UniProtKB/Swiss-Prot annotation:
It catalyses: alpha-D-glucosamine 1-phosphate + acetyl-CoA = N-acetyl-alpha-D-glucosamine 1-phosphate + CoA + H(+); N-acetyl-alpha-D-glucosamine 1-phosphate + UTP + H(+) = UDP-N-acetyl-alpha-D-glucosamine + diphosphate. Its main location: cytoplasm. Mg(2+) binds at D102, N226. It is found in: Cytoplasm. The lineage of its organism: Bacteria, Pseudomonadati, Pseudomonadota, Gammaproteobacteria, Thiotrichales. This is Bifunctional protein GlmU. Homotrimer.
Amino acid sequence: MSLKVIILAAGKGTRMRSNLPKVLQPLAQKPLLSHVISTAQKLTNEPIITVIGHGAQRVVDVIGTDGIQYAEQLEQLGTGHAVVQGNPHYNDDDTVLILYGDVPLTQQNTLTDLLNLVDDIHPLALLTITLDNPSGYGRIVRNQHHLVQAIVEEKDASFEQKAVQEVNTGMMAVKGYYLKKWLGQLSNSNAQGEYYLTDIIEMCVQDGFEVHTTQPASEMEVLGVNNKSQLQSLERQYQAQLAEELMEQGVTVLDASRIDIRGDLTVGQDVTLDVNVIFEGTVVLEDHVSIGPNCVIKNAVIKSGTEIKSFSHIEDAQIGQNCEIGPYARLRPGTELSTGVKIGNFVETKKVQIGSGSKVNHLSYIGDTEMGAGVNIGAGTITCNYDGVNKHQTVIGDNVFIGSDSQLVAPVTIESDATIGAGSTITKDAPAGTLTLSRSKQLSIKGWQKPTKN
């Protein structure tokens, strides 16, 4: 006896007006289906049974096969028919939890409450919700004793039934033996000509069982996505929830409606986030980190006391303590900064290691470089790392001073305590403790006449 989860993910999603299958549409840059699978995997170590149909191979390619058993629904004949495709993957004594690939935000504790309602004498339990506007949902029909009798789809509902505000979310937990039994009794004699999974509720009652129900804490947990408008609305609700969770952890969020978390964000104490900040992938912000407005941070670790100023883009980078980045800085993959480094406006770095206290303050490109501590890089300095075919390394020792508008043509080494004169193009190694420069001799031509316009 174990828990098996079936996720229905075969729908086309015509109203999305997209070539991408509906369950692969992104919520916080993660496919809708991936959200559901992640929650399911918190409930069981068993493979997640995922019923696919439209765009099946694309779904497999994106989601992968790790911890998942796929079942294909070749014809779209209704939710009951979809669940039948999962029958070979569970046993009679299993409890089967049925979820939907386009309902991404159901919480683990809500599903645990649902599962706790199922036992040998209560083989079926439903997740329902009461809505002010139940239009479009199947209605929960109860008798005078408030016991569930059936679910009636809106297209088949009477006028009185349409007035019911308690609706079906689609999610249920069922004992495997009874699920197979009732699925085998389904008929498609309805307005849609489909096999409704919801018809098994009436069968359960007819077999003498009570159907127990529970409800989620929030309507957002059971919201499905059928079009881009609903997807955008759910995105904003989800981001608001994530912002609220950050503030509960002590983060100062200057405007909760203008922050996007599109991955996993870990924060320390006294973190401050300004407006229009986007986090992607896996990001760690340690204590006393400040992120200015309009920054994009992806797959980065930012250590304590560091300030990221406005309009900075950081990707696949490790930033040390008490650094100062930006504004308008771009730290590309492979950037590793030690303590107290300053990267200023319009500076781009890639595949660099920069030592403690070094400064690259203005208008520079530093790539494929090992830089020591206490280095000052003047404005307009470029490491010329690419010869048209291969990338080459620049090595800069400790306490080096690079004058403005210099070009370091790799491969080249600037040894510790060296000084490079402004405007130099360095093609050979610069010795330690020396001044190295390469400039044309300055000339002042007397009697020079400025050209005049013809």
